[in-house]
Design a protein with these regions (language model features):
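Conserved alpha/beta-hydrolase catalytic His-Asp/Glu region
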Residues: 132-230
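Conserved hydrolase catalytic core segment
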Residues: 87-126
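Conserved alpha/beta-hydrolase "acid-adjacent" motif
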Residues: 243-249
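Short beta-strand/loop motif that positions the catalytic acidic residue
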Residues: 230, 236-238, 242
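Conserved acidic catalytic loop of the alpha/beta-hydrolase fold
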Residues: 72-89
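Conserved alpha/beta-hydrolase "nucleophile elbow" surrounding the catalytic nucleophile
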Residues: 29-31, 89, 93-95, 239
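Catalytic histidine-centered segment of alpha/beta-hydrolase-like enzymes
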Residues: 268-281
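Conserved HGGG/HGGXW glycine-rich cap/lid loop of the alpha/beta-hydrolase fold
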Residues: 7-63
Length: 292
């Protein structure tokens, strides 16, 4: 569904299938991603609606605006929630989406039954290599994120055709190099590159600048201590193999909240919805069911 608001036109994924008798989960994706991730999250359909996701400005099918900060992203989603008039929401955010969820939960906690942040670190520091890569070479930035954020590849059928197949022109192989819309590179492990295609394509947006804008928004985001402590029913989920977040920083983050539940997801890293959706779905269901 498309919704026109004062802050721009938003695409709200799965809104048309909402059943008032079932629980509502609102998912906010990580940097550079959009509603496509929501379809990889599927809690028990007997209890929960299909996962809602509101594309941030310039992401997915929402129109671009001047929004470039976590606060502005949260304001955009808040306006949409008011327009569609929903409450009793299980709020869930991945990585940067977790920061947006924190801002939302602090601004109007009565709307949310629970808050789940997975693989989200606050404050979220972004290294210079990733900041530079996200602004100059999106594919290079995606390489960095998958190098440190993927522990295992999902089980997929091995392609029967040559490298670069799978029905997409995102990659082409020419003279031993892989050509993408964002640059060229040599690939030592073509099978891994093909296996990662399903994840890397989630970073494709209308503008190449989106990932860079998101990374800078993460770097610049800060909350008042009083606002952090005002967030209720908060749960921190981390992939035990995630090298993109620091366990020490997660512990410090939990201390900031005062009361937060920590759950570790076994055998996955930063992108559990890609690596092993069953692990993520099981963990999220355990969290949500606590507040029903």
């Amino acid at each position: 569904m498309f919704l026109k608001t004062d802050s721009g036109t938003a695409y709200i994924h799965n809104f048309d299938s909402l059943d008032s008798e079932k629980e509502i989960v609102l998912f906010i994706p990580g940097a550079g991603m959009d509603h496509r991730v929501a379809d990889l999250i599927s809690p028990n359909p007997k209890i929960f609606n299909k996962v809602l996701s509101i594309d941030l400005p310039g992401h997915g099918s929402s129109t671009p605006t001047e929004a470039k900060s976590i606060q502005e992203y949260a304001g955009f989603i808040s306006n949409c929630i008011k327009e569609i008039d929903i409450s009793g929401i299980h709020l869930c955010g991945h990585s940067m989406g977790g920061l947006v969820a924190m801002e939302l939960a602090a601004s109007d906690s009565k709307l949310f039954k629970s808050v789940a942040l997975f693989n989200c670190q606050y404050p979220l520091f972004v290294g210079s290599a990733l900041l530079d890569g996200s602004s100059r070479n999106l594919d290079g930035a995606a390489d960095f994120l998958t190098k440190y954020g993927i522990h295992k590849l999902p089980k997929i059928e091995k392609p029967k055709k040559t490298f670069g197949s799978m029905g997409s022109s995102f990659y082409k192989k020419t003279d031993g190099k892989v050509i993408s819309p964002y640059g060229s590179k040599e690939v030592r492990d073509p099978d891994r590159e093909v296996a990662l295609f399903g994840l890397k394509k989630l970073f494709n947006q209308v503008s190449k600048d989106i990932l860079s804008i998101d990374m800078n928004a993460c770097m610049n985001y800060r909350m008042d201590d009083s606002d952090i402590k005002s967030i209720n029913n908060i749960n921190i989920l981390i992939g035990e193999m995630d090298k993109l977040v620091s366990e020490k920083k997660i512990d410090e983050m939990i201390s900031m909240f005062g009361s937060a539940q920590l759950k570790k997801m076994e055998g996955v890293a930063h992108f559990p919805f890609f690596e092993d959706p069953k692990v993520l779905n099981k963990t999220l269901e355990e969290v949500f069911n606590t507040y029903i």
